[in-house]
Design a protein with these regions (language model features):
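Ubiquitin-like/PB1-type beta-grasp interaction modules and other compact soluble beta-rich domains
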Residues: 1-69
Length: 70
């Protein structure tokens, strides 16, 4: 079974990614999904919807990571 790839922008950089959920993409890229906020096409995606929100052709996604420290 071949994967269908879509072109999108993530943090301003053009990427090709298999059509998958945002959660799957974040996990594959090594993001701690409990410490990120994701915006898809100017809409913030609630944490409980990351597993059900598909990446679509032409999406613009911003990933913001929170880091603690002092």
């Amino acid at each position: 079974m071949s994967e269908e790839y879509v072109t999108l922008k993530i943090n301003g950089e053009e990427k090709n990614a298999a059509g998958k959920t945002i959660y799957a993409y974040l996990s594959e890229e090594g993001y701690d999904t409990s410490r990120v906020v994701v915006e898809q096409n100017l809409q913030i995606i609630p944490q409980d919807q990351l597993e059900n929100t598909l990446i679509q052709e032409g999406d613009q996604i911003e990933i913001l990571c929170f880091v603690g420290g002092g």
